[in-house]
Amino acid sequence: MSRTIFCTFLKKDAEGQDFQLYPGEIGKRIYNEISKEAWSQWITKQTMLINEKKLSMMNIEDRKLLEQEMVNFLFEGQDVHIAGYTPPSK
């Protein structure tokens, strides 16, 4: 059974997460405020960041960078900027 939340990223009611996807206080906030659709958008950006910046999830500094980018993207409205990347035109 799905739950509906007000997604602070999309600024509308949307389907919420089925369970907490990320640990700690940030994870609780994501569970309560970020929809599945918004989370999917973040996962796409996260994958680009990991690949383009050659981040290693074994490296604590890389994980901290990724977490900060996630908070900026989901809660502060800042887009992820990757040097040399130009989004495809619609």
Swiss-Prot record:
Would the keyword Ligase turn up in this protein's UniProt record? no
Under the subunit heading, UniProt states: Monomer.
User: Which keywords annotate this record?
Assistant: Iron
Q: Which organism is it from?
A: Yersinia pestis (strain Pestoides F)
Please state which protein family the record places this protein in.
Belongs to the Fe(2+)-trafficking protein family.
Per the UniProt record, the lineage of the source organism begins with:
Bacteria, Pseudomonadati, Pseudomonadota, Gammaproteobacteria, Enterobacterales
Cellular component annotations (GO), alphabetically ordered = cytosol
Q: Does the keyword Cell cycle apply?
A: no
Q: Which InterPro entries match?
A: Fe_traffick_prot_YggX, Fe_traffick_prot_YggX_sf
Q: What is this protein called?
A: Probable Fe(2+)-trafficking protein
**What molecular function terms (GO) are annotated for this protein?**
iron ion binding
Q: Which HAMAP family match?
A: Fe_traffic_YggX (MF_00686)
- Which GO annotations describe the biological process of this protein? cellular response to oxidative stress
What function does this protein fulfil?
A: Could be a mediator in iron transactions between iron acquisition and iron-requiring processes, such as synthesis and/or repair of Fe-S clusters in biosynthetic enzymes.
